[in-house]
């Protein structure tokens, strides 16, 4: 009986589109067109470090990014998609792009999706797997990237720093790529 119960529970766990590897979730997203490999933030649980792979047969490119949840109700936050943001991540400072802003809780809070860009799968995942954590700090949101004008990140984000554990990263991305190749 215990064996049957174990098989049923295992079947239920594996029957959906999400597969867990300790501290990682792998699932199909965006109309089942992408595989998302994500983990929750250590400081703010609503923030996620995300890697996306398009289900295009090759599965050799990965988009690296994260979401930051903000309770600052700055009315300009909805104008941020497409803007560059200066961040510090993996020991480097660079400009990323704000890809989307989604209002939550009747619009008083927002989830901001920031992309670091597209990378070749193997090289990028090898680079990331060399670290134990991804510590991210948001510095500056550019209104005009060329002129260097804009706002301090704290104008839009109540929390400008978060960290993500990279424990089991290699296993998670391998499973994500396997799922991608099987579709």
PLM regions: where:
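Sec-dependent N-terminal signal peptides
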Residues: 4-16
